[in-house]
Amino acid sequence: MNHTVQTFFSPVNSGQPPNYEMLKEEHKVAVLGVPHNPAPPTSTVIHIRSKTSVPHHVVWSLFNTLFMNPCCLGFIAFAYSVKSRDRKMVGNVTGAQAYASTTKCLNIWALILGILMTILLIIIPVLIFQAHR
């Protein structure tokens, strides 16, 4: 019986460098050389904004709509506040800020007119009652 040993792998320390295939990118670098750029490397700065808080004033608008709604300002403010909230959810921050600013102005006017109407509704009957005495 003849026992011959066949090796499928070459020995590790055979004294010859292993035969590797050269990748396409390595071949390009070897042929062209490392790129030399005389200009200094430039950097790009990216400013990432944090989430901007845009108040939409839905609760304030709802309060003005339900309790003090002079000249329908509370209802209009509520419509604008819903638009502001929708723009904020979509990611349109500038549109949301514009609608929020209008909502705030309408809510302030609705509150002022509502308070004045409440005061007048209290004062006028008192004055009329005192005049009839």
Curated annotation (Swiss-Prot):
GO biological process, one term: host-mediated suppression of symbiont invasion
Top-level division of the source organism's lineage: Eukaryota
Signal sequence segment: none
Keywords of this entry: Isopeptide bond, Membrane, Transmembrane, Transmembrane helix, Ubl conjugation
Intervals, Extracellular compartment: 1-57, 129-133
Any one of the GO CC terms: plasma membrane
Cytoplasmic side: 79-107
Compartments where found: Membrane
Membrane-spanning segments: 58-78, 108-128
Residue(s) of cross-link: Glycyl lysine isopeptide (Lys-Gly) (interchain with G-Cter in ubiquitin): K24, K83, K88, K104
Keyword Ribonucleoprotein annotated: no
Membrane-related topology note: Multi-pass membrane protein
PANTHER family: DISPANIN SUBFAMILY A MEMBER 2D-RELATED, INTERFERON INDUCIBLE TRANSMEMBRANE PROTEIN
Family (UniProt): Belongs to the CD225/Dispanin family.
Protein name according to UniProt: Putative dispanin subfamily A member 2d
Source organism of the structure: Homo sapiens
Organism ancestry: Eukaryota, Metazoa, Chordata, Craniata, Vertebrata
